[in-house]
């Protein structure tokens, strides 16, 4: 299977590097200096005291036109439309598009480039950080889940192809499953990303602060309740009180942790808030629901991006 990974950052290199043991992998990026280092040195993945290096071809965006069986997206969520447009030569009639990015709503954009039977969404609990342009550390292990994003009544992906892809992930060292209700899995992860994670970014505090400060936690509870309400209309049913307990436990288990949206705001970078809180707001509006706290947090994030 030919798998093309767009976005050779920490996660893109992790998945591309490990999948290369079981598939024909190509990397696509936009930083010429980093791509040169990857082509020269290969991709090195470290885990504990062990490491493995694999040679994987890396190309500048728009310069590779070899049709892929699967395109795995690891860019920022707001870059999806641009990177797929720039690399449309990679997309054939049978190419499957798969995203494991944070947030929700990516499939709305991806479906501008492929039909419902070829758009996959998912989540992963793998973790990775970069030591250099071509060296990453696999910092967290966990399951990867993906499935078809087709709406009710639309044709979904070929189950045999999904199983083939799952087996490749498994053989590459990624615990993996195919979900029959992937939107539930996506909303389950969004429960943390669109509540405590985004709030830590707005307040510029570590995760533990939110769990212990009464004012911060009350805001977080409101965000969680609004997520549950919006998710229900998408067929993902959650008990708000259970989710409130789950999120608080998550924060207390990693009190000194900082989120990616915290880092983006701190360093003056554009965030993925439109695919996190924005996904909740869009889903709520389509159902005629009001989610004022999510809307306010989203506006605050954008206001801070403009500093």
PLM ranges: what are they?
Residues 27, 58-60, 146:
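Generic preference for hydrophobic
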């Amino acid at each position: 299977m030919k798998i093309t990974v767009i976005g050779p950052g920490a996660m893109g290199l992790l998945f591309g590097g490990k999948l290369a043991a079981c598939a024909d992998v190509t990397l696509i990026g936009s930083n010429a200096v980093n791509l040169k280092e990857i082509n020269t040195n290969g991709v090195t993945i470290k885990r504990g005291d062990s490491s493995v290096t694999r040679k994987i071809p890396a190309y500048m965006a728009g310069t590779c036109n070899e049709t892929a069986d699967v395109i795995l997206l690891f860019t920022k969520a707001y870059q999806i439309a641009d990177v797929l447009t720039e690399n449309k030569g990679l997309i054939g009639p049978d190419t499957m598009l798969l995203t494991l990015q944070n947030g929700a709503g990516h499939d709305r954009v991806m479906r501008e480039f492929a039909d419902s039977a070829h758009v996959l969404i998912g989540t992963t609990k793998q973790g990775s950080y970069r030591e250099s342009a071509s060296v990453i550390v696999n910092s967290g292990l966990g399951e990867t889940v993906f499935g078809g994003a087709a709406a009710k009544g639309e044709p979904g992906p070929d189950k045999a192809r999904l199983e083939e892809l799952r087996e490749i992930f498994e053989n590459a060292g990624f615990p993996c499953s195919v979900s029959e209700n992937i939107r539930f899995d996506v909303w389950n992860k969004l429960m943390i990303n669109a509540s405590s994670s985004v709030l830590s970014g707005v307040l510029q505090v570590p995760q533990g602060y939110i769990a212990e400060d009464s004012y911060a936690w009350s805001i977080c509870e409101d965000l969680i309740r609004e997520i549950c309400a919006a998710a229900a209309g998408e067929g993902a049913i959650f008990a708000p009180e259970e989710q409130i307990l789950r999120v608080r436990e998550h924060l207390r288990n990693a009190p000194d942790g900082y989120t990616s949206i915290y880092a983006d705001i701190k360093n003056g970078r554009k965030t993925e808030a439109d695919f996190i809180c924005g996904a909740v707001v869009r889903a709520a509006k389509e159902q005629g629901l009001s989610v004022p706290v999510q809307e306010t947090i989203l506006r605050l994030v954008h206001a801070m991006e403009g500093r």
